[in-house]
Curated annotation (Swiss-Prot):
Protein name: Uncharacterized protein MG237 homolog
The organism of origin for this protein: Mycoplasma pneumoniae (strain ATCC 29342 / M129 / Subtype 1)
Taxonomic classification: Bacteria, Bacillati, Mycoplasmatota, Mycoplasmoidales, Mycoplasmoidaceae
Any Pfam family matching the protein: DUF3196
Amino acid sequence: MINKPNQFVNHLSALKKHFASYKELREAFNDYHKHNGDELTTFFLHQFDKVMELVKQKDFKTAQSRCEEELAAPYLPKPLVSFFQSLLQLVNHDLLEQQNAALASLPAAKIIELVLQDYPNKLNMIHYLLPKTKAFVKPHLLQRLQFVLTDSELLELKRFSFFQALNQIPGFQGEQVEYFNSKLKQKFTLTLGEFEIAQQPDAKAYFEQLITQIQQLFLKEPVNAEFANEIIDAFLVSYFPLHPPVPLAQLAAKIYEYVSQIVLNEAVNLKDELIKLIVHTLYEQLDRPVGDEN
């Protein structure tokens, strides 16, 4: 349901939209040059090769700057723009991978420093600790991160995602943390690594049964089921580590009703308390009030 926060969604493959490799791109440019070998095209082919040389040296940052300079040149012929744009995409991809590899190789304490810089805007960098073994992530480092889980000003989804990341770090498994749920206005003591999603036993059973009922209700509507699952995710986050104080069958039926109305572009009845709860729970994850579409 809730996707594990264990990937950096950089969409790296999407950056390689036009050409799969530098070689393929260079061959395409060379083929164009054979049929359009004017002086300006020859000049830019040389500039292209200079960037390629930087790529061979793995100096992707400089290569990125050079690509951007060539694209900004007022005399760059329009037919050549796509070659440099595609080259920039490939360079951006490799620069991002290079930066990620450099960050992942940092000591755990340094990664935690980066996580806490410009708080809370870099919390997602906690994921660089996930591949590290217990030998590299000592339990005492957790003390520096505990406050994030009890920060009442932090958006619930961010706090939940941060907890889920901590829950997967081998060096922190077995350690106890305090977790504050701002919706419930309660603190909970949770053990890291004990469960994939550290819910109370009755909450785990509640959501498993809710998922099953939703699957049955949307058996012939798989696309609508995806939206219904997003609603379940929102409830899981908002009430974590508990479950909503609503009879399971009633909530499943109302989720089905709400999704069906939205898909058909029908007005929803906000006077219905359960429908209202669904809407508010969804908006809680967006950190804006119901009706604020800006």
